[in-house]
Amino acid sequence: MILPSLSQGPFSLVIGSLCMKHPNLFGGSEKLDVSWDKGLYDSNFVIAYRRPRPEKLYQQCFLLKHSMIPEIGVHGFPIENFSRSVSGGVNLSRLSAGVELKEPSGRHWSNTTSIKLEHVGMYSDDGRCIRTDSDGIPLTCSGETYDNMVVLKQESRYAKANDRSLTRVNVQIEQGVPLLPKWLLFNRFKLRFTKGMKLGPTFYLSSVTCGSMVGDMGPYQAFAVGGLGSVRGYGDGAVGSGRSFLVANNELTVPLFSKAVEGAVFVDYGTDLGSGRLVPGNPGVRRRKPGSGFGYGYGVRFNLPLGQLKLDYCTNSFRHRTLYFSLGNISSS
């Protein structure tokens, strides 16, 4: 069945989604999910197979994924006072296969461990395999048109909410294991902390996201700072792209006419912590990204049955103004 997508991020311009599910594949309650998202410039294909296990044991999921997206966050070119980013002619193809183990959820904590084999390839806009960007700089760590890696990932989530406040923590640790020569060896860490509290009729929401990476690195693995889910008022990755980063978001919402319509004011700040020069090929430095920046503005939130419709009017450090339109889940805002 074709459904409209409510997601944000690489597939925010989704044309359609195809999803097929089988709840009892081999007669033993095995579940098979197949999904395909197609955007104007992006595609994402996922096959997930789950076997039934007792609730007190790890839940297993076997995954096969393929995605193709324009690599704008790192290799894109900022324009219009960094308020937009346009393609640099580099597209990222990511094919992975692996298994995911999810621990039985506690009262507030949940943990997921996964291992996957990943093949990352670089393509031009016309579909050709490429090794270098427009400046002749290698796009991969290996120097080939692709990188291979085995990735061990541990993700822990904490969530607690009531009528007056909410707290969310997300910790991700990835370890690259070089099983063969030229396979990547690295450690990548990312943390997001979100705190919200009710202040009279208003609600204040603050979040801090940070991360760092050591070891082998392809330029496409850099942390991209800037954009709708990062620092509003900037294009995707227009603030910077580095081995490390820090982003802080603050937003205050107040009911306008009812709980279904809210006004918001916000301030965002992001920085690559001076690590842009540590990314192979210096893509952020070559594209003259500032490395740090802030955005501020105001907006309106419409809480609809399908999700939350957001309209944001932002101004960045260069005083360029941008209007954002997005649709997402209320719980993820």
What role is predicted for each listed range?
Residues 297, 305-306:
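Membrane-interface anchoring segments and C-terminal beta-barrel signals
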Residues 4-5, 15, 148-299:
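Extended beta-strand-rich architecture
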Residues 1-161, 165-170, 204, 225-232, ...:
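Gram-negative/organellar outer-membrane beta-barrel architecture
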